[in-house]
Amino acid sequence: MASKINTDIKKRSNPNDVFYTPLPLVKIHLEFVKEYVDEGDIIFDGFYGSGNYYKTYPEVFTTNTFDFTEIEMGKDFFEYDKKVNMIVSNPPYSMIDKVLEKSISLEPHTISYLIGQNNLTCKRIEYMNSNGYFLDKMYFTKVFKWFGMSAIVVFTKKSKKNCIEFDRTVWK
């Protein structure tokens, strides 16, 4: 028998559906990307939600400034137009293509998101590569027992090759 939660997730179509990132995982994510941060970088949380990312930024990134958007506060990520140096957040998985496109338009040197592992496709990696961003690091984790694996991914212009290799040959 399928769980009601799993069924609800599969049927959701509202991009405002949210699942907040547990604070301990936020801290792991921020430590995971710390090496990409330069002094004075503007670090951006495009999906404030409960605020766990934005509120934790100053604990990990001590010489930086921060900004955020949150639709519930009247600050829409898709209308944000300031340039940033780094994006670190947990976007809505249902809108990942639009999120990646908008993220690139903000011209950061590094984009790091917590995404569902099924969102990490060859096509999306190739899209990021074609825009000068390479998958430099990944960290797989189980956020919720009722949801599959998720991945912290780091796409950066500071690298010139992906940390994984793949081919799109259909063998049979």
Describe the role of every protein-language-model region.
Residues 1-172:
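Class I S-adenosyl-L-methionine-dependent methyltransferase catalytic core
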